[in-house]
C-alpha cells in the first residue's frame, strides 16, 4: 500500500424521534435558538457517562448535527468518543429519555447512561 490514507470519521445522527422530542422541548422553553448539547464526562459505573443539556451558544470547536429544525451540539473532546453514534428518544416503563447508541463503547452499564471504550 502506498501513500497516506485519509480518514473521515462517521458523523453523528439525531433520529426523527429525538428531533421531534427536542423540537417540543425547545417550543416549551420558548427559545427557538436552543440546541441539545450532548457531552461525555468521566464517571458512572463504566468509566464515562453521557450528559444532556440545553445550549443557546455554540463554540468554535463544537460540531452541530441537525435533523429538520432540531439541532444538537457536541464539543470537540466529547465528539471523539461519540463519532458514529446515534442519539434517539425512547419512551417505556422506565420513563422517557434521550439515549445514545454508541458503536465505540466496548461495554455499557445496565441503564445505558455510562460506557467504556
From Swiss-Prot:
Q: Does the keyword Iron apply?
A: yes
Q: How is the cofactor bound?
A: Binds 1 iron-sulfur cluster per subunit.
Reading the lineage from the top rank, the first entry is Bacteria
**Lineage, opening ranks:** Bacteria, Pseudomonadati, Pseudomonadota, Gammaproteobacteria, Oceanospirillales
Q: How does it assemble?
A: Homodimer.
Q: Name one Pfam family in it.
A: Fe-S_biosyn
Asked if Cytoplasm is a keyword of the record, the answer is no
The entry's family comment says: Belongs to the HesB/IscA family.
GO BP? iron-sulfur cluster assembly
Which is one GO molecular function term here? 4 iron, 4 sulfur cluster binding
Q: Which Gene3D superfamilies match?
A: HesB-like domain
The protein's required cofactor(s) are namely: iron-sulfur cluster
User: Tell me, what does this protein do in biology?
Assistant: Required for insertion of 4Fe-4S clusters for at least IspG.
- Residues binding iron-sulfur cluster: 45, 109, 111
Please give the name of this protein.
Iron-sulfur cluster insertion protein ErpA
- List keywords of the entry alphabetically: Iron, Iron-sulfur, Metal-binding
